[in-house]
Swiss-Prot record:
PANTHER family: TUFTELIN-INTERACTING PROTEIN 11, TUFTELIN-INTERACTING PROTEIN 11-RELATED. One of its GO terms (biological process) is spliceosomal complex disassembly. Residues 710-734 are annotated as: Required for nuclear speckle localization. One of its GO terms (molecular function) is nucleic acid binding. The modification Phosphoserine is found at residues 2, 59, 98, 144, 210. Keywords: Biomineralization, Cytoplasm, mRNA processing, mRNA splicing, Nucleus, Phosphoprotein, Spliceosome. It is found in: Cytoplasm; Nucleus. Residues 1-50 are annotated as: Required for interaction with DHX15. This is Tuftelin-interacting protein 11. It comes from Oryctolagus cuniculus. Residues 1-21, 50-136, 183-236 are annotated as: Disordered.
Amino acid sequence: MSLSHLYRDGEGRVDDDDDERENFEITDWDLQNEFNPNRQRHWQTKEEATYGVWAEHDSDDERPSFGGKRPRDYSAPVNFISAGLKKGAAEEAELDDSEDEEKPGKQEELPKDLGPKKLKTGGNFKPSQKGFAGGTKSFMDFGSWERHTKGIGQKLLQKMGYVPGRGLGKNAQGIINPIEAKQRKGKGAVGAYGSERTTQSLQDFPVVDSEEEAEEEFQKELSQWRKDPSGSKKKPKYSYKTVEELKAKGRVSKKLSAPQKEISQVKVIDMTGREQKVYYSYSQISHKHSVPDEGLPLQAQPPPVPGKEAKAPGFALPELEHNLQLLIELTEQEIIQNDRQLQYERDMVVNLSHELDKMAEVLEHEERAIANLSKVLELVEQCARRLQPACSNPLTLDECARVFQTLQDKYYEEYRMSDRVDLAVAIVYPLMKDYFKDWDSLKDCRYGTEIISKWKSLLENDQLLSHGGQDLLADAFHRLMWEVWMPFVRNIVTQWQPRNCDPMVDFLDSWVHIIPVWVLDNILDQLIFPKLQKEVENWNPLTDTVPIHSWIHPWLPLMQARLEPLYSPIRSKLSSALQKWHPSDSSAKLILQPWKDVFTPGSWEAFMVKNIVPKLGMCLGELVINPHQQHMDAFYWVIDWEGMISVSSLVGLLEKHFFPKWLQVLCSWLSNSPNYEEITKWYLGWKSMFSDQVLAHPSVKDKFNEALDIMNRAVSSNVGAYMQPGARENIAYLTHTERRKDFQYEAMQERREAENMAQRGIGAAASSVPMNFKDLIETKAEEHNIVFMPVIGKRHEGKQLYTFGRIVIYIDRGVVFVQGEKTWVPTSLQSLIDMAK
């Protein structure tokens, strides 16, 4: 903004001697033009003030100028300003009027656009200036001088290859027509009469000038034509923020978006200025104004930079700067908030459109559900009408099942959502009671199984994770079986005799896959087991002709472990019955044999050791071994129990009661010049009385090898005495044959065990991996049905403890150690198996 109009004297002239003096007096001209501040005023020169209308005008005055200030004439003598009285306002008004009367048409000669406003170039034209000096000549005949010459230019161009009608250059790339010039209409500045482009330029360069861009660029360079007093030629740089940048910034100014900082009251002492100031929050520092340092003492003012002229500081307006900055921030905040609001509204429109689509889908779904529910209600009401006693076409159970099947097939969702329990109670239960009113389950155990299976698929709630008595309110089928079917079963069980178990077992086998699990458990625990328990208490093994296993064992597939409480009283009664038993009575074996696989291995072995083995030992002790007249009945009574008692128990009986007497008879026979052929037959005859499993036992094998050694020593010791021909060779051959049989049997057993182990392996890779001793123990435990598992959190000397049946063991370098009373004792695998059994 130019302030040159402030540096004039009382007569409106600029003081050449003191350009920095400001005159703020209000003249009569200011009062007269109070409501017309844009009126241009003609400042009178010295000659006009002296001579008035008779003043002469130099040609320099008529020359157009871009500045409102008249250039100085340094060749003229020095003029002094008169210190006389200032002319009055009335006298100046007369001069203005006379001047206006003399020049009535000066304003009319200018174009319309330059009438009431200033040109934007910053200069002021006087009304008396009508044009530029020498600018009235027309350029229409430019270049016509070529007609009065010899055309040397045209000839030279043609010699250099120029072809008329084509452009200049090697490739004729030059322009064909000369550049046209357009004459300006008036005497105004550039752009005062609109665009000055010619028709040729519009054809060659069809780019439309943007008047808005030109105006913006013009306003940008408007105030930069003046020279900086400091002599700097650097142009000021302006920074602009677009709306897109503000949107990308996406945040509000910290001063306006963080009012919570005002809450923190912190005392801040500011000593950066001339005096100490105290603030009570950090946010107040941001509101501090930058005050000029005009009041600082000379000592506190910064020293001037050497080599540069000290620039006088202009007047600063910190309040104005703060207000402008605040307006900028408010505008930015408003733009950001409007952008956020616009984005929010757009998102809201998208969300509402999605909600509208969802609600349309929900509405359509609800309409379908209402239509389906109406049809379901119609079917249910039809069934209710047919259930009335006076109905001519009563509803049957099969027809009702078809109605429910229709509901499940066509209206599945509504059927699942409806309260099937109440619907079944109201419609199905009366029909079901009428269907089973004459039913005798022991005579016709499969009566009603098909219709109940159909109703199970229709009524059972398959979403229940666990079924129990608490499901009566949630499952219609369970409630149907409990309230309609169970009363008939209770009535039948009360009349049933436990010793006649087959009809009841067949009945439950027919219904076990139909009735709920908890209903079957209730029947077995509350109805069947009490009657069996009572019957076992009344059973006497000495007087009852019907063996107990005939009416207990049929319940094993259904009751399984539920019969465990009955086994103890059964063993007790059997043990009492065996007190006076003799091994010659084979009925005991017939009674006990069905229980071998029912009792646990440990309990069965304990029962045998307590009640059977002592009787067999007593019988074997009474056996008389006589090679000439042998009675084998007692031996047969003992060997007949081989499958009932364990091999170890049988071998123990033989070691204690048989082999000592047998070896003694052999020695006595060999000492009396025997017939070795008869001894060989006697040896082979006794050995054939034992099974391969007994013969494979190490103790039995040692006893027979001991007999062979005795026979070999007897043959070898009779040197010089009479010896039966071929006796020594026969005994040697017998020994070799027996040893070879033992070796072949052991090899066959090892091969059989290897084949079994290979079959248990899953895949070739598993079978190729060598097994360790722990795997071997695990295999043996599986073969003998013994539980083998590690003890959690228990170790001995860093070794994991295991339970093998009821025995605690640990494995160390291929050796099994068994926990004794005080120490750990090593044992063999076979002994471990025998102890576990």
